[in-house]
UniProtKB/Swiss-Prot annotation:
GO terms for cellular component: cytoplasm. PANTHER family: 12S RRNA N4-METHYLCYTIDINE METHYLTRANSFERASE (PTHR11265:SF0), S-ADENOSYL-METHYLTRANSFERASE MRAW (PTHR11265). Signal peptide: none annotated. It is an enzyme of class 2 (transferase). SUPFAM superfamilies: Putative methyltransferase TM0872, insert domain, S-adenosyl-L-methionine-dependent methyltransferases. NCBIfam families: 16S rRNA (cytosine(1402)-N(4))-methyltransferase RsmH (TIGR00006). The gene is rsmH. This is Ribosomal RNA small subunit methyltransferase H.
Length: 299
């Protein structure tokens, strides 16, 4: 199995400013691309905690990380539940959080997971294979209005109403490639030639299946309480919807606490910055093209 190539790896490691004795939480472990480099920098007193819903990813990461060190804990659950596990471990503060919100290339490569719009597979798209809701339930079960809402809110799908109507009129849709064909045939030829419209539709359905935006918002609301002074949270985003959520959340944290009209020195509790991939990284890793690394530091 070819390992998932982590995006913005150098920037992540540099900006985490890893304390060898610190506690670092990778909330989207994947195949430990980022985590393996974090673990290499930790001493025996440090700890890495990794979350992933995908049990296959957890097992592969365990094998990979075990070759580096044993001071890690892997948790097969959605990162939205991170607080429950940190409380169980009596951890009140961490030295860094990392989220990589992209779908791993391994998940895309496995046609049977149904994430890829270029491979024949079932309409699945579940990151947690134990959950009941699948892409098939949405594609073949939701009404036109609900589909349209998902397409607009999760991916800004162009001509979402036409795509939703096309799906409803062509049911039952059996697999990923049939869905791609239905999407393409629902839209004007000029739009289809310009850009593969299936990409945004698949993104919207995947987000709905896994409740990704709600999970992200719930996590952000609890996250900063766990950061130590001078520690950071790093979030890699890949599309405008999730990026806007992170950007707006960070923006609210750095807002001046005092009325600007008052003669009081500006007080800020957080510092933020954004990093984009270099042309060199994009050339080496196509996935990096749409990525952004957003960083918030507790002061």
């Amino acid at each position: 199995m070819q390992l998932h190539k982590p995006v913005l790896l150098k920037d992540v490691i540099e900006n985490l400013e890893i304390n060898p004795e610190g506690i670092y939480v990778d909330l989207t472990l994947g195949y430990a691309g980022h985590s393996s480099e974090i673990l290499k920098k930790l001493s025996s007193k440090g700890k890495l905690i990794g979350f992933d819903q995908d049990s296959f990813a957890i097992e592969k990461s365990r094998q990979r990380l075990s070759q580096i060190s044993d001071n890690f804990v892997l948790i097969n659950d959605n990162f939205v539940n991170f607080k429950v596990y940190l409380d169980k471990m009596n951890i009140s503060f961490v030295d860094g959080f990392l989220l990589d919100l992209g779908v791993s290339s391994v998940q895309l490569d496995f046609a049977h997971r149904g994430f890829s719009y270029s491979k024949l597979g079932p309409l699945d798209m579940r990151m947690n294979l134990d959950q009941p809701l699948k892409a098939d339930d949405i594609v073949n079960g939701y009404d036109q209005e609900s589909l349209c809402k998902i397409f607009i809110e999760n991916a800004d799908v162009k001509l979402a109403k036409q795509v939703a109507k096309g799906i409803v009129n062509n049911r039952p849709i059996k697999d990923t490639l049939e869905l791609v064909e239905v999407i393409r045939s629902s839209l004007p030829a000029a739009l289809v030639r310009k850009k593969n419209p299936a990409k945004a539709v698949f993104q919207a359905i995947r987000i709905a299946v896994n409740d990704e935006l709600i999970v992200l918002k719930k996590f952000l609301a609890q996250s900063l309480d766990f950061l130590k002074k001078d520690s950071k949270m790093l979030i890699i985003t890949f599309h405008s919807i999730e990026d806007r959520i992170v950007k707006d959340f960070f923006k609210r944290q750095v807002k001046n606490k005092h009325d600007r009209r008052l003669p009081i020195m500006e007080q800020k509790d957080y510092q933020v910055k954004t990093i984009k991939p270099t042309e060199e990284e994009i050339a080496q890793n196509r996935r990096a093209k749409s990525s952004k690394l957003r960083i918030i530091k507790k002061l």
